[in-house]
């Protein structure tokens, strides 16, 4: 009698030399909690809109293994509908599906003191994001929850907020980490620019606005340690000579510009240092301030001048790569000049010891190091130096924040890698998730799903794919008795140890119960076909 081979799930490199107790019920709750929190965090980073790409629930795949957790993001191609819309409207601004564009303001805290008009105002402008507070003694945080969690059934059960909001801030992102407490008093202050270069800024600086929101919310709820300074004076100190840009806000002069900056920040600081102010008034002014902050322009570029406005508590932002200015010697010289002026002015204002402490703090937080090197647009998750749209940099910046946050909070080495999928058959997990989505949303039979998947396999077989095997178990089609249906195309040998196989498992909750999907893809030994799991160094 022939000996039965080990299951393919055990022969995978990811699951070898692992503790069997890892798959017991003891760790199930921990894995479920981790998965739900990761998905809610991803969806809160950037909700999708009609013309902008965002993290949508179900568009990321999280694979938990005994020693690693893989997170797969799948970025589709630009829809044909948008291409036709751009051609039909030559005079309109063309929306780019991969660009993050303008980030909506963070919705303010809902309370009983607020009027119905203010609540409708928040819902209209803050669509997609909602701030819910959690009044806990041990957690001095606020979490940005997605407005709606589909497919999972996890509703927003966070308690309603209390009057004392000094205990109730939780901002989604890397600012949760305790190492950012040293810069909690720093405030972002910027100048509005509505000049002819605003269209360039929308393409080159899409990742700045989320950081401004985090910084504003972070400073607003700090009521213990206050930092008294004049934002306008500090701004004038830190802008390099000859690098300033004239005001373009409707012909406003420098004095009126200073007054606008002061008026925007005056009530902002007063509300943050007093807990006895009217909560409804503070909420209304905060919403107005955040909306104005979302419309600010963070840098302006012309043929002869450059305007760089650094601020504490966030990253130093400069023109992005992809528009032909990143390697310009003039920009490099202006960046070094700004850094030199920053050190000189800091030394004159605070003294050498304080300056060195501040510089070390920024180096520890990754600020000055990035400034000296030039802002790193492509972090190590892009390994093959592919040409991608520069709007994609926003996604990379958010992933970098997410990676550092997960690494610091879990004390593990977190690697989030971006892999370009040339074919859907490169990932068994993608096919398994796609089948589970179809079974959960549409009453479609397994045979029709299988026929749609395998119809393009003959076209990609010369590229390294030998075959595919798909099994689906459960009450398929509403049957009273659960059964298993399998489909096979090509060669799918599961009894050879040196066979290159990608395996994935997915579950979906339907009205008839839970159904499971297993996908195995076999790759040729001679060709260069490989799965996503093989792109990681395991």
From Swiss-Prot:
GO terms for molecular function: RNA binding; structural constituent of ribosome. The keyword ATP-binding does not apply. GO terms for biological process: translation. Pfam families: Ribosomal_S3_C. Residues 111-134 are annotated as: Disordered. Keywords: Mitochondrion, Ribonucleoprotein, Ribosomal protein. Residues 120-134 have a biased composition (Basic and acidic residues). It comes from the Eukaryota. One of its GO terms (cellular component) is ribosome. It is found in: Mitochondrion. SUPFAM superfamilies: Prokaryotic type KH domain (KH-domain type II), Ribosomal protein S3 C-terminal domain. Belongs to the universal ribosomal protein uS3 family. PANTHER family: RIBOSOMAL PROTEIN S3, MITOCHONDRIAL, SMALL RIBOSOMAL SUBUNIT PROTEIN US3M. This is Small ribosomal subunit protein uS3m. It comes from Oryza sativa subsp. japonica (Rice).
